[in-house]
């Protein structure tokens, strides 16, 4: 038997083939196997099929690799994963090589240029080749989630190939920003911000009475500004209250304003691997209606807040670990305060929400409708305050005599307080009250 011959050639009675008993036994075993093993794809074995499709697919694969290299930019990210950057209909799309979107892109290239479909094996070989090119020949580029610094400019991704450019002199919406952002299927397009809003108007949607709860007001509004600073460990928002205190509405409003998603609130995952996936895909995660937290879960939240490393198995077929370091914004709500471990309490902003009296309750649909109508101005107010806070930090006028835990955040929140019309002492006083709640 010659290499590359398949069992079906031996069954052709018009040819004489001399085989030994051992070879015959091997052939019989092969013929008894499933078709995928006994008669592999022509592209796998190297054999040319009767219709020449194997050669056609091989040629098509080579041509598609050349086309992709010509029309797309191949690069790898900070986690050494390959991507293609494609200019398409006036905007730039990023596809992670090996993803479902990337497979659709390859299929479209084949159809657009040749009017042919790709075999699964051809797709696999194209994918493997382009992944290696992106990893070993492509440039390393950072991919960001929702916000990013670049040369003193802060960028906020709106999710529709637009971003907000924030500087010390103001902000503007920019088409096709120079920063590359990750996007995921759950993500929703953020509204375009507009000027002229008042951030304090947000409190009416959050069951916070500024006359009675000024400290909570200051802590929350400064948080909404400072949370957009990337790579700074932020405190965890921890609202709690009895049923009817609008905890879930509070969480949905915050999530929508900062990091809009189809997944507004989520349950805490049972496995650490699921949590890593969530951290990779969300800038702000809201865990809803928690009853308690185990020691492991408390530790995970602390690590996710401060950016300590998580490891995740790359493939079940090997022992390679992928190391992830995320500093994520987190919100945890429950009937009682679920942050009970000292390390987690030290990293939390505690908000005790009171039940809304029956005569003052408004259904959530109405609240969210009103919020969505005002959201562009609220978002614009955040960016205006953030621009002022950046200018204050640049001028060096923010100084803290005693730096609390999460000191970098406290500096930004103090600048945000001044930008919003409060004083640094107002923020520090509210922050200290929060510490006292932790120790109560």
Describe each region flagged by the PLM.
Residues 107-111, 128-135, 218-231, 383-388, ...:
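Short, hydrophobic/amphipathic alpha-helical patches that form generic packing surfaces
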Residues 53-59, 206-219, 371-377, 402-404:
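Structural motif
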Residues 232-235, 261-267, 272-284, 293-297, ...:
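Feature primarily recognizes SF3-like P-loop helicase cores of small DNA viruses
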Residues 85-91, 170-281:
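P-loop NTPase catalytic core of nucleic-acid-dependent motor ATPases
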Residues 1-27:
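Non-catalytic accessory segments of DNA primases and related replication-initiation nucleases
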Residues 291-292, 302, 306:
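Catalytic acidic motif of RecA-like/P-loop NTPases
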